[in-house]
């Protein structure tokens, strides 16, 4: 892990300094390498949005979501400002051009303007609207304030929003239940280092990622209605994945090189199931 990180970080620093377009792709390469090291096997359903910019809206179980989603979603994460100061991971977040936000309501408008500016530059953003992580067996209520940027047109067009659900479903090829799923979760007052060490020794892990239908705020009339829709779709997606109701995807990858074509013959239903 450290060797892979030390190898790529200098390249990313140079790419960002000289504004070379590859800087937007390098984080995805790093995440895919980490997936391979930790033996994460990703099962992909649905079709990834080709539109730029797109706001990807995702559920949040653990810091592992960053690695899993970073391997398949071309974009920058939106994270709490405290992450900026984390040893090593704060540096990695900055090198992925993460947008850091504070939880204070007084800064909401400022953060919304910053995120809108990034979208206007053509950057995709990845949002965790729950505002925190959980045990992986459910989806917490979405905070509609995070969807304020979706109310603004980007280059004269409504912003594309794609709900994406991620669920931790297998360990060494065997489906896991409610009691084991929290092994992947990181929430509350859990320490990072012991949890990361535990994950590294768990064996081959399976994650299910579903790309749901792309929507815009115009379809729902308000950011609150859009947030409610995304919450319902993602909740259903997680439920389908952890209960085994999803038909196995045609493609499982250690190194998900072509997520745009994953599970090519199927599209998510309106209910959110793939």
Region locations from a protein language model:
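N-terminal membrane-anchoring alpha-helices
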Residues: 1-43, 241, 249, 253-274
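Catalytic core of membrane glycerolipid acyltransferases/transacylases, capturing the structured
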Residues: 8-28, 35-37, 50-106, 156-157
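Short amphipathic alpha-helix with an adjacent loop that forms part of the alpha/beta core around
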Residues: 46-50, 114-120
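Residue-level preference for the first positions of well-ordered beta-strands
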Residues: 53-55, 124-128, 160
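Amphipathic coiled-coil/heptad-repeat helices and related helical stalk/stem segments
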Residues: 62, 85, 108-112, 142-143, ...
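A cross-family acyltransferase "interaction/gating" segment
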Residues: 89-90, 104, 136-221, 225, ...
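Soluble extracytoplasmic domains of inner/organellar membrane proteins
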Residues: 115-116, 123-125, 129-142
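C-terminal alpha-helix
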Residues: 232-241
């Amino acid at each position: 892990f450290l060797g892979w990180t030390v190898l790529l970080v200098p390249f990313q620093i140079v790419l960002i300094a000289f504004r070379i377009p590859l800087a937007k792709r390098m984080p995805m390469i790093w995440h895919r390498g980490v997936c391979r090291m930790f033996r994460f096997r990703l099962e992909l359903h649905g079709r990834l949005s080709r539109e730029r910019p797109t706001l990807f809206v995702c559920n949040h179980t653990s810091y592992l979501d960053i690695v899993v989603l970073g391997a398949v979603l071309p974009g920058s994460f939106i994270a709490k400002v405290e992450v900026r100061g984390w040893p090593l991971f704060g540096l990695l977040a900055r090198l992925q051009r993460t947008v850091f936000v504070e939880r204070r309501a007084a800064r909401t408008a400022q953060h919304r303007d910053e995120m809108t500016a990034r979208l206007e530059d053509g950057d995709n953003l990845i949002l965790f609207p729950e505002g925190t992580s959980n045990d992986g067996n459910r989806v917490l209520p979405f905070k509609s304030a995070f969807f304020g940027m979706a109310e603004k047109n980007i280059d004269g067009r409504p912003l594309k929003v794609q709900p994406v659900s991620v669920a931790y479903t297998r360990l060494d090829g065997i489906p896991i239940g409610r009691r084991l799923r929290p092994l992947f979760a990181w929430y509350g007052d859990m320490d990072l280092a012991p949890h990361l060490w535990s994950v590294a020794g768990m064996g081959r892990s399976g994650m299910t990622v579903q790309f749901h239908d792309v929507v815009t705020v115009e379809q729902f009339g308000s950011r609150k209605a859009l947030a409610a829709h995304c919450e319902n779709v993602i909740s259903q997606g997680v439920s389908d994945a952890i209960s085994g109701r999803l038909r196995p995807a045609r493609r499982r990858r250690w190194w998900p090189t072509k997520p745009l074509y994953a599970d090519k013959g199927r599209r998510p239903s309106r209910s959110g199931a793939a």
